[in-house]
Amino acid sequence: MALLLVLQWTSAQADGFDQSAWDALLKKHVISLRSGQATEVDYAGFAADRSQLKQYLASVSAVTTAEFDRWERQAQLAFLINAYNAFTVELILTAYPDVASIKDLGTLLRSPWKKRFIPLLGETRSLDDIEHGLIRGSGRYAEPRIHFAVNCASIGCPALRTEAFAGDRLEAQLEDAANAFLSDRTRNRLDANTLRVSSIFKWYRRDFEKGWHGANSLAAFLALYRAQLGLDEGTAGRLKAGKIGIEFLDYDWRLNAKGSGKS
């Protein structure tokens, strides 16, 4: 019996954090569009349930570094992605409904992503600290698909999922997010001999060129998703050979709010 309890405790530690509260809020207040290629967020609904959101954020903030370090890698990454997305919603709510873009919440000297308002793993952090420090900068994860998972509250962003990320399902969830984003022709499309893709691929190009599934160039990464991009095998080959150009679309920074119509 004692051994069984130890094994159950160890498994619970490895599984990470209970995301049921965040999952329930997402299911209630995120609206799927175009078969999940995009979503809109009911910020008024989130505002009405802000006490539940704050309770969830408090539970996130209560996690210690020692606890976090005991979790499996996938559970850690799911926790960080969920934290980023939930604290982004909270940031929007600090000004909602008088906010048309997350960029409105910054100043000339400091972007909203550099605001330190997030108590997390023993420090007060910014959204940039989570994404570029804990996720991208830690060296633990080497996962380019996080760029299809973190959501910056904008129409141009990959969709905020209608469910929380979970460590035991993270691989499938990240792949689903990548498939949804890359199959969205408002964000990524072939025009004649030019592949026009989201500016995400410009800003984070290096992340897509680090050898994930053998992709050492942006073209090679995009060719991995040729079906989602609507490319036949020959076109994907020409893309990898540099015979199809890559250009980056303008980013739509308008708030991804319910009724925005294009998100």
Model features per residue range: what roles?
Residues 1-8:
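Bacterial N-terminal signal peptides
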Residues 10-14:
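Sec/Tat signal peptide C-region and signal peptidase I cleavage site
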Residues 15-263:
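Interaction/scaffold regions that mediate signaling and macromolecular assembly across diverse proteins
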